[in-house]
Design a protein with these regions (language model features):
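Divalent metal-coordination and catalytic microenvironments
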Residues: 17, 47, 109, 167, ...
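Non-catalytic positions within long, well-ordered alpha-helices that form the structural scaffold/packing
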Residues: 6, 99, 156-157
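Active-site environment of divalent metal-dependent phosphoester hydrolases
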Residues: 20-23, 54-57, 112-116, 140-143, ...
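Mid-to-C-terminal alpha-helical segments outside catalytic/metal-binding sites
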Residues: 183-232
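An N-terminally biased module of ancient metal coordination in phosphate/nucleic-acid-related enzymes
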Residues: 1-44
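Short acidic, glycine/proline-enriched helix-loop-strand junctions
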Residues: 23-32, 41-46, 173-199
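Short acidic/histidine-rich active-site segments
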Residues: 158-176
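Extended substrate/RNA-proximal surfaces in nucleic-acid metabolism proteins
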Residues: 26-134, 212, 217-232
Length: 232
């Protein structure tokens, strides 16, 4: 996967294993593996750790004790993943409580979550509350179907999206590759937006800085003209 990233021109990678009831997040072991890989790749990649954090009670208790273990590069941005069975109304308060600790939630791949696709007003509320949103590069490239692609592009246009990430899982079907997604965003929104989502905001989160690009959330925009989708 590291070789895939280097070939794609990627310079910074955050390894984000799941942290939930099924997958135990062992911070010490994750850091050991990160250090081993960093030594192997040298200065070709800058590697950090984080996790895809599920908001279950046990996880939240651990977060209160030491949030840095779970955050990107042990700074203050946290990747948050929702399940597709239910997102309780209390989630508004849960996200707010996380923010009060100084942690900045980044909601991951909402364009692939059926609940949030059906109720994008919830996503908009959280963004207006100060949360951030990350969509998957594969969604923008059409790899997760036309609905995920459509919603991801529309939400970028509405100012809901702050990051694009690979969400890579392997070297075959979900690889560390972002060039097709970058081309898609640049074709529809221009180079400035592409740089913000793929380079400038991600680097700021990596370093624990304020995001340089936080667009104002717009009301729902009309769908783009059909011809704009055919850029492959």
């Amino acid at each position: 996967m590291a070789q895939c990233a280097i070939a794609d021109g990627i310079t910074h990678v955050v390894a984000t294993p799941h942290s939930n009831s099924r997958f135990h997040f062992d911070f010490v072991r994750v850091r050991e593996l990160r250090d081993e890989l960093q030594a192997a790749v040298g200065d070709k990649l800058n590697l950090a750790t984080g996790c895809d954090f599920h908001l279950d009670p046990e996880n939240l208790d651990s977060l209160r004790k030491d949030a840095s273990h779970y955050c990107i590069n042990q700074r203050n941005y946290l990747l948050v993943e929702f399940n597709e069975i239910s997102i309780p109304p209390s989630m508004d308060q849960t996200l707010h409580e996380i923010q009060l600790t100084g942690v900045r939630p980044i909601i991951t791949h909402p364009e692939r979550n059926g609940i949030l696709r059906a109720h994008p007003e919830r996503l908009k509320k959280w963004v207006r509350q100060g949360c951030f949103v990350q969509v998957t590069g594969g969604s923008l490239a059409g790899n997760f179907g036309p609905r995920a692609q459509k919603d991801a592009l529309q939400w970028i246009g509405e100012g809901l999206v702050h990051f694009v990430a690979s969400d890579a899982h392997n070297t075959r079907t979900r690889t560390l590759q972002l060039q097709p997604a970058y081309a898609a965003v640049m074709a529809q929104f221009g180079v400035e937006k592409a740089q913000a989502l793929f380079l400038e905001n991600p680097l700021a989160a990596f370093e624990g800085r304020e995001l340089p690009h936080v667009p104002e959330v717009e009301d729902e925009l009309p769908p783009p003209r059909r011809k704009r989708f055919f850029f492959f």
